[in-house]
Amino acid sequence: MFPLNFHYEDVLRQDLLLKLNYANVMEVPGLCEIRVVPKAPYNFIIKNGKLAMEIPCGQKFIQTQRGSTGKSFRSNPFLGSNKDKGYVSDLARQSTLRGHGMSNFLVRILTVMSLLDFPVEIRKNSIQFSMETEFCEFSPELEDHFEIFEHIRGFNVTIITSANTQDETLLLWSGFLQKDEGETQ
């Protein structure tokens, strides 16, 4: 288990239980997933996007098969498929992280955010921010592949939580940031 998971289970979850006055520990909000979308031109994403997203996210992409009926939401131009090039949304180019991959990526995000100042937008059940290419400078595994990232203008990151209100999301996010600050001091 990652230290961030221990922090959530042992410290943050109990703190939120008391602050939000919940009767049941299962009501306490947690992290569900992290969505990462590269800010790059469409033609770059087709050619190099798969590799550019695999390296920082730490997970291998798999090609999904399109169903036989009509347009499929699983048709993913980000993976280099030649299907349905008419409409491409950000959802078609995103990487979704859950479980250990999410925890590992969140540790990296918190480390970079403690060094740089990224504006964060906190909503009802999500935390959104844009990471510029400086993220690459703080990740040793990315420095070896800078030619892939030189055309990416950064990443849009959305952290989805199970919170019901913006205040719950804010408390959850500030708890993770305090954990990171506590380790660096």
From Swiss-Prot:
Q: What does the sequence similarity comment in the record state about its family?
A: Belongs to the universal ribosomal protein uL5 family.
Instruction: Determine the domain of life of the protein's source.
Output: Eukaryota
| Molecular function as annotated in GO | RNA binding; structural constituent of ribosome
Can you name this protein?
Large ribosomal subunit protein uL5m
Q: Name one GO cellular component term.
A: cytosolic large ribosomal subunit
Which Gene3D superfamilies does UniProt cross-reference here?
3.30.1440.10
Cellular localization per UniProt? Mitochondrion
Q: What's a BP term from Gene Ontology annotated to this protein? A: translation
Q: Which SUPFAM superfamilies match?
A: RL5-like
| Record's keyword annotation contains Ribosomal protein | yes
Keyword entries, A-Z = Mitochondrion, Ribonucleoprotein, Ribosomal protein
The record's principal subcellular location, in a coarse class, is: mitochondrion
Assembly and partners are described as: Component of the mitochondrial ribosome large subunit.
Query: Which InterPro entries did the record assign?
Result: Ribosomal_uL5, Ribosomal_uL5_dom_sf
Question: Beyond the main fields, what else does the record say?
Answer: A stretch of 270 kb of the mitochondrial genome is duplicated within the centromere of chromosome 2 resulting in the duplication of the gene. The expression of this duplicated gene (At2g07725) is demonstrated.
Record keyword Protease present: no
